[in-house]
Design a protein with these regions (language model features):
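Membrane-water interface of transmembrane alpha-helices
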Residues: 57-75, 184
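C-terminal transmembrane-bundle signature of multipass membrane proteins
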Residues: 142-147, 152-160, 164-197
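Membrane-helix interface "capping/anchor" motifs
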Residues: 19-30, 133-145
C-alpha cells in the first residue's frame, strides 16, 4: 500500500473513530487499535518520529481503553462507567504530568532523531497522553485536550505534506467541539441524577 493510500485509508478510519467517540460507542477502541498501528508507518516515513511513537502508545492505550470501558464498573450496582467532570483534585497532577511528558519527549526527539518540529511534535504527544487517559475515564474535559491537539496536528500535517490527515484533524476540531457539548449534556444528567438519589436518600431518613 502506497503512502498516499495509507494516508487516505487511515483518514477514513479516523472519521469512523471520532463518530464512534461522539456516540460513546465502545467500538471506538477497536478502530483505535487498527488505525494507529498503520499510522506508525505513515508518520515515520514523513519524519514525524514523535507521532510515530505516539501511535505505538495509541495502540496500547486503545487496548486498555477497551478493557476499562468493557469491564470497569461503578461500585453502585455494577453500572457502566458514566460521563463525569474531572475532579478538581486531579488538575494539578495532570498539569504536572503534561509538562514533564512534554519536556521528556522533546529531549528524546532532539537527542535521538532528526525531527524538524520537536517542540510541537512533543507538545501534541504529551497532551495526547493526557487526553487518552481522560477519555478512558470518560471525563468531559478530554474534549478540551483533543481540540488543542487536533488543531496543532492539522497545521503540522499541512507542513509535512500529508493532506488527508490534515483534513481529518481539521474536521476533528469541529467534531470535538460538538462532542464536548453532547458529553456536557450527558454529564449534567448524571450529576442531576446523583443529586436526586442523594436527596431522596436524605429525605427518607428525615422525621
Amino acid at each position: 500500500m502506497s503512502l498516499g493510500w495509507l494516508d487516505l485509508f487511515t483518514t477514513v478510519l479516523g472519521l469512523l473513530y471520532i463518530w464512534l467517540e461522539y456516540r460513546v460507542n465502545i467500538w471506538l477502541w477497536v478502530v483505535g487499535i487498527v488505525m494507529p498501528a498503520l499510522d506508525i508507518v505513515l508518520y515515520w516515513s514523513h519524519g514525524l518520529y514523535g507521532d510515530a511513537g505516539m501511535a505505538v502508545y495509541y495502540t496500547l492505550a486503545a487496548i486498555y481503553g477497551f478493557w476499562f470501558w468493557k469491564f470497569k464498573k461503578t461500585r453502585k450496582k455494577h453500572e457502566p462507567l458514566p460521563i463525569v467532570y474531572m475532579p478538581r483534585g486531579k488538575y494539578l497532577p495532570v498539569a504536572a504530568f503534561f509538562f514533564i511528558a512534554w519536556a521528556a519527549t522533546y529531549y528524546v526527539l532532539v537527542t535521538w532523531t532528526n525531527s524538524t518540529v520537536p517542540v510541537l511534535d512533543s507538545f501534541t504527544n504529551a497532551l495526547s497522553f493526557v487526553g487518552l487517559w481522560a477519555l478512558s475515564r470518560k471525563y468531559l474535559e478530554q474534549w478540551f485536550f483533543w481540540i488543542v491537539v487536533d488543531a496543532v496536528c492539522c497545521w503540522l500535517y499541512v507542513q509535512k505534506g500529508i493532506p488527508f490527515k490534515a483534513f481529518l484533524y481539521g474536521l476533528y476540531v469541529v467534531i470535538a467541539i460538538a462532542g464536548y457539548y453532547k458529553w456536557k449534556g450527558m454529564a449534567k444528567r448524571v450529576k442531576s441524577e446523583d443529586y436526586m438519589k442523594q436527596r431522596i436518600k436524605t429525605d427518607s431518613t428525615d422525621f
